[in-house]
Swiss-Prot record:
Quaternary structure and partners: Monomer. Interacts with DnaB.
GO biological process: DNA replication, synthesis of primer
Name under which the protein is recorded: DNA primase
Keyword Metal-binding set for record: yes
UniProt domain comment: Contains an N-terminal zinc-binding domain, a central core domain that contains the primase activity, and a C-terminal DnaB-binding domain.
InterPro entries, per database record: DNA_primase_core_N_sf, DNA_primase_DnaG, DNA_primase_Znf_CHC2, DnaG_bac, DNAG_N, DnaG_primase, TOPRIM_DnaG_bac, TOPRIM_dom
Residue positions binding Mg(2+) 2: D300, D302
Residues that bind Mg(2+) 1: E256, D300
Family: Belongs to the DnaG primase family.
Annotated Gene Ontology cellular component terms: cytoplasm; DNA-directed RNA polymerase complex; primosome complex
Organism, as annotated: Rickettsia prowazekii (strain Madrid E)
Binding note for cofactor: Binds 1 zinc ion per monomer. Binds two Mg(2+) per subunit.
Keywords from the UniProt entry: DNA replication, DNA-binding, DNA-directed RNA polymerase, Magnesium, Metal-binding, Nucleotidyltransferase, Primosome, Transcription, Transferase, Zinc, Zinc-finger
Coiled coil residues, start to end: none
């Protein structure tokens, strides 16, 4: 009996995988998942994990993985189709009979899948020393060539002859998406003189091919024509290899090209898939979210990559929530993922992953970076664009968080660029002052002094991101901040080694100024050993926010007649002043005690 793909999906949704697994082994709840001793290898410590929400099992020991049907297949020795039938019978689920059209569809599908497997065997036999050398120069190893079944389609009639010898009608190759027809009616091999890369579905069946030209012909890459088994809007290259790793790491990395996937997989990043040169679709996103809660986009940094990012952002915003996330790796200029890992190594790419930015941060980068906002109109347009993004979010809590995030970014990055600094006499909360620095510059120095005196604070991502994203008036100080965060904080340099490292740089004078025991830029009470760092951070953050408010307050008074908005600024300023006064009293009490 043949079972449809739709019925497979019905079983996955209908039957809790933990109920089936529990019949074979004891499971213990751990957070939202279950754990137990793996039935597929000997172990003493449970490494077998089951997730009902993701409808998936994974063993951290032997790497066995799959859905409820795959588990039944592995346990019973039955085929995938037979296991689906067994589960349906065990749970009293009626198996729908195939209609005549469905039978014809699956017969045709089987024929196409068989032709594609034969085509792949042929392509694999055509790898010449020249082709292998090309692949080796791209740092693709012999093991990887075999693992991904990379082949070659020669520029001759061997391909057609191969199938004719097997008594397979040439028109069947067209149904499989392997050949095309010229305007004059002549049939041609779609992948002639191209490296071939088989595209497999989630069940590890070849459903199409990608082809990469050897020379400079265009198009450089192409895919099989779409068929009844191959739709680019649904398939992701590498998905059959990525799913178990994505489940294990609770994330997927989405790139643009075949060789990006191959290079990253070879470097140990097995959770990588590619979108086959097409726009990312809702189907792609939902498929990846079923395996892991986070999708990390790693697209080229050129204009095409930025446009692809914007399309994906607009597609994803109605779908994301506090659990289902999108983030972005920002590649250095001129690098694609393949180049990044081959030229700089796996550790370099791992650091790029660690420094990935959130969806909200990517939106801000796209709308703000490299642009000027000198006029009220330009600023209003920025606010409108950001609001439009927020309005696409369906999750109300997340939408509110995005509004707050963009509001904070506008304060930090736009208001601080105004030349005029307004300090109303009502502001009785003062930071340590100097004849050489404005109050804002004093705060910039104070933030940098935190790097040196309290580096533990920067383990908090929110604090690190806030400091890193500030646009300093003092550009030398900004360069010091970037260097110190990346080279000292991120690399966890030991305290007794820092001075020797900084001494060899152009930042040594700044370092000495900021690291003095009687630091001018931090209040005397902040230098106590028992200072509560959370209060210290609140004080500095609120002080910085207050200065921004004061500047925006002044701009609002001078540039428009929106009195309601002016009153809101004034009310917020008074509120922050009072909060700072309370914090000041806390520090005074600490100093006295």
């Amino acid at each position: 009996m043949r079972v449809t793909q739709e019925f497979y999906e019905f079983l996955r949704n209908r039957i809790n995988i933990s109920d089936v697994v529990r019949q074979k082994l004891a499971l213990t709840r751990k957070s939202s998942n279950y754990v137990g001793l793996c039935p597929f290898h000997q172990e003493k410590t449970p490494s077998f994990t089951v997730s009902d929400s993701k409808r998936f099992f994974y063993c951290f020991g032997c790497k066995a993985s799959g859905d409820v049907i795959k588990f039944t297949s592995n346990i019973s020795g039955l085929s995938y189709n037979e296991s689906a039938i067994k589960l349906a019978n065990d749970y009293g689920i009626e198996i729908p009979k195939l209609t005549v059209k469905q039978k014809e569809f699956y017969e045709e599908s089987d024929n196409i899948l068989n032709i594609l497997e034969l085509a792949n065997k042929f392509f694999r036999t055509q790898l010449t020393p020249e082709i292998l050398n090309y692949l080796y120069k791209r740092n693709i190893t012999e093991t990887t060539i075999k693992e991904f079944s990379i082949g070659f389609a020669p520029r001759n009639n061997k391909f057609e002859k191969f199938f004719l010898d097997k008594k397979i009608d040439i028109t069947k190759l067209g149904q499989a998406g392997l050949i095309g027809k010229c305007k004059n009616g002549k049939i041609y091999n779609l992948f002639s003189n191209r490296i071939t890369i088989p595209i497999r579905n989630i069940y590890n069946k070849i459903v199409g091919f990608g082809g990469r030209v050897l020379g400079n012909e265009l198009p450089k890459y192409l895919n099989s024509f779409e068929t009844i088994v191959f739709q680019k809007s649904d398939i992701l290259y590498g998905e059959h290899k990525a799913i178990s790793s994505s489940y294990k790491k609770n994330r997927s990395i989405l790139v643009e090209g075949y060789f990006d996937v191959i290079a990253l997989h070879q470097a140990g990043f097995n959770e990588v898939v590619a979108s086959l040169g097409t726009s990312v679709t809702e189907s792609h996103l939902h498929k990846l979210w079923r395996a892991g809660d986070e999708i990390i986009l790693c697209l080229d940094g050129d204009n095409a990559g930025i446009k692809a990012s914007i399309r994906t952002i607009n597609l994803a915003l109605p779908l994301v929530n506090s659990e289902k996330k999108i983030s972005f790796i920002r590649l250095p200029s001129g690098l694609d993922p393949d180049d990044a890992v081959n030229k700089n190594g796996a550790d370099f790419f791992a650091k790029l992953i660690d420094k990935r930015i959130s969806l909200s941060e990517m939106i801000w980068h796209i709308e703000y970076s490299g642009k000027n906002f000198r006029t009220a109109e330009e600023k209003a347009n920025l606010e409108k664009n950001l609001k439009d993004y927020c309005n696409k979010i369906s999750d109300s809590n997340l939408k509110a968080s995005y509004y707050r995030f963009f509001k904070d970014q506008i304060w930090q990055n736009l208001v601080t660029k105004q030349k005029k600094i307004i300090t109303p006499s009502s502001n009785s909360v003062l930071i340590a002052s100097s004849h050489c620095y404005s109050e804002l510059e004093m705060l910039e120095h104070a933030f940098c002094a935190l790097l040196i005196k309290f580096p533990i604070m920067f383990a908090e991502k929110d604090i690190r991101d806030f400091i890193l994203n500030l646009n300093f008036n003092n550009k030398s100080l900004e360069e010091f901040r970037n260097w110190y965060l990346n080279e000292i904080i991120d690399n966890k340099v030991k305290e007794n080694e820092i001075t020797a490292i900084v001494e060899k740089t152009s930042f040594f004078d700044i370092f000495l100024l900021l690291s003095k025991a009687d630091n001018l830029f931090l209040d005397i009470s902040f230098n106590k050993n028992n200072i509560r760092l959370d209060l210290l951070w609140q004080w500095l953050y609120k002080k910085y926010y207050l200065i921004n408010l004061q500047q925006e307050y002044a701009i609002s008074i001078n540039s428009n007649h929106d009195f309601e908005k002016v009153l809101l600024y004034k009310k917020e300023i008074i509120k922050i002043v009072n909060e700072l006064q309370v914090l000041n009293e806390s520090f005074i009490n600490q100093t006295i005690t």
